[in-house]
Design a protein with these regions (language model features):
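Short, hydrophobic beta-strand segments that form beta-sheet elements in well-ordered domains
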Residues: 36-41, 255
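N-terminal hydrophobic or amphipathic helices and topogenic motifs
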Residues: 2-37, 122, 129-205
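Secondary-structure junction motif
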Residues: 39-52
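Extracytoplasmic small-molecule ligand-binding "clamshell" domains
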Residues: 37, 56-61, 65, 69-70, ...
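Acidic, polar ligand-binding/catalytic clefts
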Residues: 22-32, 84-106, 115, 194, ...
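Extended, hydrophobic interaction surfaces within ordered domains
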Residues: 31, 57, 64-68, 74-149
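Hydrophobic alpha-helical segments typical of transmembrane helices
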Residues: 46-49, 107, 123, 136, ...
Length: 257
């Protein structure tokens, strides 16, 4: 994730339910985005990324991705632009909205460890590879990114051991990392970290923090591994060691069905 953290998505259903449909032409084809009016959260680079693909696009700015989605639902904007998995989560819980299949930009998401922690990187890569080789990876995606409805409950993954695996995350990136109804930090990234802890025979401890604090905390040794929809970039790779990519995401467009 290259954008600033968003507010919790727990109110999205009730917020969107208040809105009606406007008189704008529905976006049904990716090419229609070329001159579309986008709703984007203030303080992110979503507008810059969209403009790099569609120079003639227009932008309206909102306080959060929730407000941007509401603008689309009410007809105040043609599309909302944000991280693909977060938009998919919104669309899954709110009939009448969908994410266009073609992304505007493409990013690879990965977990990060300290530059010298080759053993932990190898363990993460092995878990990712083994899950992809079987059915577990797709089952995990179906669990956290259902076509309709909210994510399924966090699976029970017992982690035990004298050593602790400290997993740093920012629980504002539903469905990758978020706080559920029981006030536990859950999500696809948390599940993956638990599987890594199991492989290493360690006990998982989740450390929730601000998105921008994750890399500094990792470098300082406050956590062992970080993950929260983190985009693999050359600049970040100068200071941390990334795992293999576990998800292809990027900036996508949320539109009315």
């Amino acid at each position: 994730m290259q954008l600033k953290p968003i507010l919790s998505l727990c109110l999205i259903t009730s917020l969107l339910a208040l809105a009606g449909c406007g008189g704008r032409e529905k976006i049904t084809d990716f090419s229609q985005l070329a001159q579309a009016e986008f709703a984007v959260p203030t303080g992110t680079v979503a507008d810059q990324l969209v403009a790099s693909r569609f120079p003639e696009a227009r932008f309206e700015y909102y306080n959060s991705v929730l407000d941007a989605a509401l603008a689309v639902r009410s007809g105040k904007a043609d599309a909302a632009a944000y991280d693909e998995p977060i938009l998919r989560n919104i669309a899954g819980k709110n009939p009448g909205l969908k994410v266009l299949p073609e992304p505007i930009t493409v990013d690879q998401y990965g977990y990060a460890v300290r530059l010298e922690d080759l053993e932990l990187k190898a363990a993460i890569d092995a878990v990712i590879s083994e899950m992809r080789a079987g059915d577990e990876y797709q089952q995990m995606l179906d669990r956290w990114l259902p076509r309709q409805g909210a994510p399924a409950p966090m699976p029970v993954l017992d982690t035990a051991g004298e050593e602790v695996l400290l997993f740093g995350t920012a629980a504002v990136t539903e469905p990758f990392s978020f706080v559920d109804g029981s006030q536990q930090v859950v999500g696809l990234d948390v599940e993956m970290a638990a599987r890594v802890a199991q492989r290493l025979g360690r006990r998982l401890e989740v450390v929730n923090m601000e998105f921008g604090a994750m890399i500094p905390a990792l470098i300082a040794g406050k956590v062992d591994m970080i993950g929260a929809c983190i985009t693999i970039t050359e600049e970040r790779a100068k200071s941390v060691l990334f795992s293999e990519s576990y998800y292809t995401g990027g900036i996508s467009a949320l539109v009315r069905e």
